[in-house]
């Protein structure tokens, strides 16, 4: 798989921002079929950094409604990537 097919988007939240500042860990939404090795290679190729560790979480869908219309959010996969000491991803710097 192409790195841009594996990494869907960065996850920007208060918790993910604290992980960046304190732990050097970056959070991404990734393709649900991707495994940890594929995610590691995709991040290393896309951002030219050295990945030390990858943790993944399958985030379940939640029921939602708007008025009488009921639906569900999509199930998605979250990857928390720890980089080698001294490496940073510039995409997250301006946030």
Curated annotation (Swiss-Prot):
**In Gene Ontology terms, what is one molecular function of this protein?**
rRNA binding
Which is a Gene Ontology cellular component entry for this protein? ribosome
Q: Where are the transmembrane segments?
A: none
Answer yes or no on keyword Ribosomal protein.
yes
Q: Name one GO biological process term.
A: translation
Q: Which InterPro entries match?
A: Nucleotide-bd_a/b_plait_sf, Ribosomal_uL23-like, Ribosomal_uL23/eL15/eS24_sf, Ribosomal_uL23_CS
Keywords for this protein: Ribonucleoprotein, Ribosomal protein, RNA-binding, rRNA-binding
Question: Does Coiled coil show up as a keyword for this record?
Answer: no
Assembly notes: Part of the 50S ribosomal subunit. Contacts protein L29, and trigger factor when it is bound to the ribosome.
Q: Which family does it belong to?
A: Belongs to the universal ribosomal protein uL23 family.
Entry function: One of the early assembly proteins it binds 23S rRNA. One of the proteins that surrounds the polypeptide exit tunnel on the outside of the ribosome. Forms the main docking site for trigger factor binding to the ribosome.
Q: What is this protein called?
A: Large ribosomal subunit protein uL23
